[in-house]
């Protein structure tokens, strides 16, 4: 192999690895901060139990912070349900999706562990683990989580899609998360994010109804992706192109506009990112 070709290959691999490692760290960090601050708001302090509005506002702000930190690096998923939705919509490859989810679960666990470590013993006993409340059945809990996550993922797609809006994704997605909490707290404590449920459950070892907070959100995310990408705003990718994107052998049209540009300054050009 020619030396010049070797150098180009080395630079390509090195640059690709740098981009991937930054994206994974961004997902790890964003999810960890989201869990630390969000779950921290539901802790049952004896002198002042948290109100539903307080929890909703805190999760709103935690979401906005996580999105603002990571959206230009990784796309600001910070949620396995969002990553699955992007995979179903052919906006991310399977290898990258698996790596993202692993980073998210690791970040959620570290965030929950940090919160557990700094919280007094009597307050941290349940660590905000999601459970079913108010005589809600498991079927009802799954349905609630499905609907809550469906509206969240639809908002994520619409907020991140540069074809639709130039507003702030952090503010809009944060508002969607707050909306979910204002309703969902009474049913399930409101997850909408399997990583948010996973981290605290790992630290305190409570998995009694943990499956609900995977089945509901992931199903809602898939439905939201199908609705947005195939009904509301369908694209023209062929089956072959979608399969190539799935395995990471082709370029992917960006739903997330990482570097927003004025549309009038572009002439027949499209933003793309390399799928991995």
Swiss-Prot record:
Tell me which residues are glycosylated: 134
Which Gene3D superfamilies does the UniProt record give?
A: Glycerol uptake facilitator protein
Q: Which keywords has UniProt assigned to this entry?
A: Cytoplasmic vesicle, Glycoprotein, Membrane, Repeat, Transmembrane, Transmembrane helix, Transport
Q: Where in the cell is it found?
A: Cytoplasmic vesicle membrane
Which terms does the UniProt entry file under GO BP? Answer: nitrate transmembrane transport; odontogenesis; renal water transport
What does the tissue specificity note say?
A: Kidney.
Show the GO cellular component annotation of the record: cytoplasmic vesicle membrane; transport vesicle membrane
- Give the domain note: Aquaporins contain two tandem repeats each containing three membrane-spanning domains and a pore-forming loop with the signature motif Asn-Pro-Ala (NPA).
Q: Which family does it belong to?
A: Belongs to the MIP/aquaporin (TC 1.A.8) family.
Q: Which PANTHER family match?
A: AQUAPORIN TRANSPORTER (PTHR19139), AQUAPORIN-6 (PTHR19139:SF113)
Q: What is this protein called?
A: Aquaporin-6
Report the source organism: Rattus norvegicus (Rat)
Gene name for this UniProt entry = Aqp6
